């Protein structure tokens, strides 16, 4: 399946909540509760839509993947670790339906994020990931992101990643 990301609208909110809830339940079932185990609400999705641009990949009316890009630096990211990018975008969240994970959909979403960043125009994509069993650090490395630093957030190790576009 070739993924097509589109900007999420208010009509997508309930489907995005369902997707994020399924991903959260999957992570808890695999790794137990942790910093990654946060609930999702319509209010939270609408807030994400105000602070950034939420993209969604759908099958029919159901969200199967989503990611959020923003020009706003998340407060947990320390820019001293990153390069001299003049126009960074921040990947602030990404979820893929548990039944679609490990099938290339996440990589396709990041390829689309890279394309979107070039058109924005941005010169890099920055993100953080937990350095824990539930973290996606290895996935981001395999997709071409470069580790640029590490920090502790809420007593959990974070890895900062950057990709020049």
Positions of predicted regions on the chain:
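Conserved N-terminal entry element of GNAT/NAT acetyltransferase domains
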Residues: 1-14
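Conserved GNAT-fold acetyl-CoA-binding loop/helix
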Residues: 17, 21-44
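A short helix-loop-beta-strand connector motif used in the catalytic cores of GNAT acetyltransferases and
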Residues: 44-56, 73-74, 90
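Conserved beta-hairpin
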Residues: 52-67
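Conserved acyl-donor/pantetheine-binding loop and adjacent beta-alpha core of acyl/acetyltransferases
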Residues: 66-93, 101
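Conserved acetyl-CoA-binding loop-helix of GNAT-fold acetyltransferases
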Residues: 96, 102-115, 138-142
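Conserved active-site alpha-helix within GNAT-family acetyltransferase domains
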Residues: 107, 119, 131-149, 156-157
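Conserved GNAT acetyl-CoA-binding A-motif
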Residues: 110, 117-129
